[in-house]
Amino acid sequence: MGVEKQIIRAGTGPNPSRGQNVTVHCTGYGKNGDLSQKFWSTKDPGQNPFTFKIGQGSVIKGWDEGVLGMQLGEVARLRCSPDYAYGAGGFPAWGIQPNSVLEFEIEVLRAQ
């Protein structure tokens, strides 16, 4: 599967380019294998938007590839197969089981 994108709200700006610092709001779903269960959000109390260098492998592959295909201001849901998420190791601290399909709702706030 890789990464599948469903647009929730279209963007109006340009797509990010590899190597840019991209800032996003993100909510991740798939805790304990249940795609309706949130495991993390930048919108939770005490959290802030997340910034990463796109296309450099600093985040999961689903984010690197999925966000490259998004426009500034776009909100989309990305469904990531295990090999595009946390793979065989999962992410136990967040309740992500090994080989889990995950979904992320991402809003692209900035790219520079």
UniProtKB/Swiss-Prot annotation:
Presence of the UniProt keyword Lyase in the record: no
PROSITE patterns tied to this protein: FKBP_PPIASE
Disulfide-bonded cysteines: C26-C80
Reaction(s) catalysed by this chain's protein: [protein]-peptidylproline (omega=180) = [protein]-peptidylproline (omega=0)
Localisation per UniProt entry: Cytoplasm
GO molecular function, one term: peptidyl-prolyl cis-trans isomerase activity
Pfam families the UniProt entry points to: FKBP_C (PF00254)
E.C. number: 5.2.1.8
InterPro entries: FKBP-type_PPIase (IPR050689), PPIase_dom_sf (IPR046357), PPIase_FKBP_dom (IPR001179)
A single GO cellular-component term on record: cytoplasm
Domain PPIase FKBP-type positions: 19-112
Record's keyword annotation contains Isomerase: yes
Primary location: cytoplasm
Region (Disordered): 1-22
Domain of life from the UniProt record: Eukaryota
Alphabetic keyword roster: Cytoplasm, Disulfide bond, Isomerase, Rotamase
Family under the similarity heading: Belongs to the FKBP-type PPIase family.
Role played: PPIases accelerate the folding of proteins. It catalyzes the cis-trans isomerization of proline imidic peptide bonds in oligopeptides.
Subunit structure: Interacts with FK506.
Name the record gives this protein: Peptidyl-prolyl cis-trans isomerase FKBP12
Organism: Vicia faba (Broad bean)
